[in-house]
Amino acid sequence: MSTGFFGDIQKVKYEGPDSDSPLAFRHYNPDEIVLGKRMEDHLRFAVAYWHSFAWEGGDPFGGRTFDRPWYSNELDAAKLKADVAFEFFSLLGAPYYCFHDADVRPEGRNFAENTRYLNEIVDIFEKKQAETGVKLLWGTANLFSNRRYMGGAATNPDPDVFAFAAATVKSCIDATKRLGGENYVLWGGREGYETLLNTDLGRELDQMGRFLNLVVEYKHKIGFKGTILIEPKPQEPTKHQYDYDVATVYGFLKRYGLESEVKVNIEQGHAILAGHSFEHELALARALGIFGSIDMNRNDYQSGWDTDQFPNNVPEMALAYYQVLLAGGFTTGGTNFDAKLRRQSLDPQDLLIGHIGGMDCCARGLKAAAAMLEDGALSKPLDERYAGWNGDFGKKLLTGLSLDQITAEVETKDINPQPKSGRQEYLENVVNRYV
């Protein structure tokens, strides 16, 4: 049943590259076969509940710009928001969604009331998932917006805050499991510090390690089959966050014995904030064996902060999905649009148009990545570049020779290597030919 919020807009369909309709897909065809699999099953698109339905259009210099009928801290408003959200998922044809607890329920007076509200909304979500076929990609807890978390959640100097956060995560894992969620995400927006003058860094890291171990223990206790994911980000809102980037997260997981239990959810905008490219973070996660899922968006490259815009750069998407395909594709993960409208984009159809453009961009990137993979366009030059390591001497260097023996080989064989071209310009041109 229509809520009326989207007027007479019909379900978005694939019309092909010649379509000029802003409410149709030009490149995203869910049933198109790419590398033997449906495009929908490769991309596994999800809509972010928070940016799409909870964000009000504010910024540090001004308040709300959007006028939505569900903007109040009442249970009835949360129920209306759920109706509109699932109508949107169905219109868009998105197979998944993601949410924080605070996105979907009113803020209660205490933990018990928060949990009761969350469970009431989960009752509604269960019915709507059954009616629409839309599934939950991942759930998470908002451990950063409420003022109780201003000094962190797991890393807070007050053990009562740690306990409240832990109980909240338990309720959110329960909700995620009940809804058939395929992952559970932890993002530490307040897990870090503003100044070392009032921070015991070592203690806070140990607290965070304990917190994550509790999450993993509870996952196994209740039989939750989903993947636990950490989402790296270097700063914002905190000056320095402990989950800075993929490399930092991996070091943290290794220290606390969790590298085989937890993977990463990588956001393009966060990679940029950390001084990396998106494909760098994806490639590193793949190399370290912790690749899990992605949040798709982009940042304004001039502003220097996290703008969470919809993706529109096809070459960037091609290189990102190339790494995803090299990792074997998504298993429990997917492509969550952690992207929001610009605060002047007020109309309901703007929300559809933003997602349509992002989905088309990702589809083009996926197809380009698949073609490069099939043709060996990047892998063949890479194999040639490292071919020497497949020879006898290269293998011995990695497996058996001591430093003395290597030195003897260099002297005996008069090894005097000459540099070879890295062919970067050629490879950049190759990528552009595919997009």
Swiss-Prot record:
Q: Cofactor note, please? A: Binds 2 magnesium ions per subunit.
Query: Which residues does the record give as Mg(2+) 1 binding sites?
Result: E231, E267, D295, D338
Annotated catalytic residues? H100, D103
The family database entries (InterPro entries) matched by this protein are listed as: Xyl_isomerase-like_sf, Xyl_isomerase-like_TIM-brl, Xylose_isom_bac, Xylose_isomerase
Keyword presence, Cytoplasm: yes
Listed GO CC annotations? cytoplasm
Show the catalytic activity. Answer: alpha-D-xylose = alpha-D-xylulofuranose
Classify the main location. cytoplasm
The protein's required cofactor(s) are namely: Mg(2+)
Top enzyme class of this protein?
isomerase
Which GO-annotated molecular functions does the record name?
magnesium ion binding; xylose isomerase activity
Q: A single GO BP annotation from the record?
A: D-xylose metabolic process
Question: Which SUPFAM superfamilies does UniProt cross-reference here?
Answer: Xylose isomerase-like
- Which Pfam families does the record cross-reference, listed alphabetically? AP_endonuc_2 (PF01261)
Instruction: Indicate where this protein resides in the cell.
Output: Cytoplasm
Give the family, as the similarity comment puts it.
Belongs to the xylose isomerase family.
Quaternary assembly = Homotetramer.
Q: What is this protein called?
A: Xylose isomerase
Q: Which gene encodes it?
A: xylA
